[in-house]
């Protein structure tokens, strides 16, 4: 073997994987420019203004608890699932059913792009979350809420907030 002729073996990559990785990087870059991390009380006031207090029988504290355990109050949070779907925004809404991502064959029940869920003004996110909550399982649609908030005393989530 001659010096300098060795090169690492290149493994072929399926184009879909490369495109998914590129889309993931672009999504992260785009969302990071507009992301916002709310404080607990600031988010409580915003969600109250959107009418989530008492919506479908859930308290404002339920929503704040969900947002904390789903995203840490970060509007730009994006999580990639093993099945290729993504969870987006402060409530980590999944692209498998609720929003349009790269896969054109999803129901898109919220009739919006997943990137809309990264907007710090939360309007689209709240509209979609309200639609999800209309499902029979309500906030139970979110694993984070079921594991961390359901059936617990959540009063601390809004204590001290001037609402």
UniProtKB/Swiss-Prot annotation:
It is found in: Secreted. Its main location: secreted. One of its GO terms (biological process) is fusion of sperm to egg plasma membrane involved in single fertilization. The lineage of its organism: Eukaryota, Metazoa, Chordata, Craniata, Vertebrata. One of its GO terms (molecular function) is lysozyme activity. Residues 36-163 form the C-type lysozyme domain. Coiled coil: none annotated. Residues 1-35 form the signal peptide. The gene is SPACA3. Belongs to the glycosyl hydrolase 22 family. Keywords: Disulfide bond, Secreted, Signal. PROSITE patterns: GLYCOSYL_HYDROL_F22_1, GLYCOSYL_HYDROL_F22_2. Interacts with ASTL. The keyword Transcription regulation does not apply. The keyword Secreted applies. One of its GO terms (cellular component) is sperm flagellum. Sperm surface membrane protein that may be involved in sperm-egg plasma membrane adhesion and fusion during fertilization. It could be a potential receptor for the egg oligosaccharide residue N-acetylglucosamine, which is present in the extracellular matrix over the egg plasma membrane. The processed form has no detectable bacteriolytic activity in vitro. Disulfide bonds join 41-161, 65-149, 99-114, 110-128. Transmembrane segments: none annotated. This is Sperm acrosome membrane-associated protein 3. It comes from the Eukaryota.
């Amino acid at each position: 073997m001659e010096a300098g002729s060795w090169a690492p073996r290149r493994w072929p990559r399926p184009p879909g994987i490369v495109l998914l990785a590129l889309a993931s990087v672009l999504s992260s870059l785009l969302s990071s420019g507009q992301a916002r991390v709310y404080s607990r009380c600031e988010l409580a006031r915003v969600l109250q203004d959107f009418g989530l207090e008492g919506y479908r029988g859930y308290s404002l504290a339920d929503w704040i608890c969900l947002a904390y355990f789903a995203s840490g109050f970060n509007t730009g949070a994006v999580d990639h699932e093993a099945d290729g779907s993504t969870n987006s925004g402060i409530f980590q809404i999944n692209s498998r059913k609720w929003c349009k991502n790269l896969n054109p064959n999803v129901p898109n029940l919220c009739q919006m792009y997943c990137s809309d869920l990264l907007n710090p003004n939360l309007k689209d996110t709240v509209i979609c979350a309200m639609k999800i909550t209309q499902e029979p399982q309500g906030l139970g649609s979110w694993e984070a809420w079921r594991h961390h908030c359901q059936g617990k005393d959540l009063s601390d989530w809004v204590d001290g907030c001037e609402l």
